[in-house]
Design a protein with these regions (language model features):
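Long, contiguous N-terminal structural blocks used for assembly/anchoring
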Residues: 1-105
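Acidic, proline/glycine-rich low-complexity IDRs
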Residues: 94-157
């Protein structure tokens, strides 16, 4: 289930870094406009990023998801085996990968490498933080006409 993804990722970081990992889902009442996604985000107690969502492909969304699970956002060190992160990505996208789905992130990318290295994020992009208590938080938003889902991970150190 979706909640197991949240618990598994949070537990992987439990002793290594202060981390916050959340998964949200609901029926889509916000439409397909990136400017309206902040209403969904705010309804979950997260920070608005003023509609600054960047549309990305499914492959990019999956790659970012795997890196979010397997690497420390602040240090770039491995905190979970890539194979386990890939399994969690499969579980998440099983729920949020319909043919008409679109994917968004809160990255503002200057230059997008084919496989993003989160540790080098500051060389490529800036990021609007979603979690109000996190130094850095990155999210993947999946939306289609029926449902909206968000995976977000943050770190303080």
């Amino acid at each position: 289930m979706i909640i197991n993804i949240e618990k598994t990722v949070s537990n992987a970081f439990h002793h290594k870094h202060p981390v916050d990992c959340r998964v949200f889902y609901e029926k889509n009442q916000y439409g397909m406009s990136a400017a309206k996604f902040d209403r969904f985000v705010q309804s979950k107690g997260l920070s608005s990023i003023d509609g600054q969502w960047k549309e990305i492909s499914y492959a990019e969304a999956r790659s970012i998801f795997i890196d979010l699970c397997s690497r420390s956002l602040c240090y770039g060190t491995e905190v979970m085996p890539t194979s386990k992160a890939d399994f969690l990505a499969s579980q998440f996208f099983k729920y949020f990968n319909k043919q008409e789905s679109k994917y968004f992130t809160n990255f503002i990318l200057d230059s997008y490498p084919s496989m993003i290295n989160i540790y080098k994020l500051h060389n490529y992009a800036s990021c609007h933080s979603l979690l109000p208590t996190s130094l850095l938080s990155i999210g993947i938003l999946s939306v289609n006409t029926e449902e909206i889902g968000l995976f977000v991970r943050g770190e303080w150190d």
